[in-house]
Amino acid sequence: MITKADKNAVRKKRHARVRRTITGTAARPRLNVFRSSKHIYVQLIDDAAQTTLVSASSKDKALDLTNGGNVEAAKAVGKLAAERALEKGIDTVVFDRGGYLYHGRVKAVAEAAREAGLKF
């Protein structure tokens, strides 16, 4: 019998493996990306204090998006997260792609955040 691993389970395993080495601090928080089929979510997390410093998602009222599951929405979310981070005085982060491939929406979030002024 041929069995195929669940994609999300494999992603979670990959993310756990990466998270052993990547940690965020108050000075340099972790920019975490979560992607669903309809929306994309970004958080800047201080792992030392276990707090979320900044968050943005395609569900935010500030963005007023009709479709939250495409590359354009991901760019808008990345830009919004970077703007909110810069308002709080955060300019450098550690990028955590959440076990997803660095492609498509995840890449769009990263590039938009870089263009808006975050360094990573």
From Swiss-Prot:
Keywords: Ribonucleoprotein, Ribosomal protein, RNA-binding, rRNA-binding. GO terms for molecular function: 5S rRNA binding; structural constituent of ribosome. GO terms for biological process: translation. Signal peptide: none annotated. SUPFAM superfamilies: Translational machinery components. It comes from the Bacteria. GO terms for cellular component: cytosolic large ribosomal subunit. InterPro entries: Ribosomal_uL18_bac-type (IPR004389), Ribosomal_uL18_bac/euk (IPR005484). Disulfide bonds: none annotated. Belongs to the universal ribosomal protein uL18 family. Part of the 50S ribosomal subunit; part of the 5S rRNA/L5/L18/L25 subcomplex. Contacts the 5S and 23S rRNAs. HAMAP family: Ribosomal_uL18_B. This is one of the proteins that bind and probably mediate the attachment of the 5S RNA into the large ribosomal subunit, where it forms part of the central protuberance. This is Large ribosomal subunit protein uL18. The gene is rplR.
